[in-house]
Amino acid sequence: GSTDVSSASGEAKNLEEVSVVLDWYPNGSHVFLYDAIEEGYYEEEGLKIKVEFPSNTNDAISMTSAGKADIGFYYMHDVIQANANQNIPVVSIGAAVQNPVNVLMSLGDKNIKTVADLKGKKIGYGGSVLNEAFVKTMLKNAGLKEDDAELIDVGFELMSSMTTGQVD
């Protein structure tokens, strides 16, 4: 899905349209983008921003590298891997956040309070090799082995995979 979030005054101007694919659902990491649109900063620079919402976890890099989007929000480590291992022609032009925004969460009735409580549980992670590595590192640092928990790639379905019982 997508949305044209430029203000109405942009319609009267001759603006260059720029498509931006998000890395995830709109969230706090994208505040600066929406704020600049709302304040008219892009229009002042002659740009009309069209925000695209991804349908899967690699849309930002695949759409950008295929020329179907001008800019994609993506994860630094995945851009490096794409360049190094898959020869995908994308470059990093800036950082939206300065630190990873990964979190560990579960439903309250699962009684998971620490990483050690994940023993015997099904752990969902969002669609990348690095996210899987983050989970494995958390387990190791808590004194658990990789096979002490079941790791499941749930893509964008982090919340629904918990509420449906697919993961803990």
Model-derived segments and spans:
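Short, low-complexity, disordered segments immediately C-terminal to signal peptides
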Residues: 1-15
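Short, glycine-/small- and polar/acidic-enriched structural segments
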Residues: 11-154, 160-164, 168
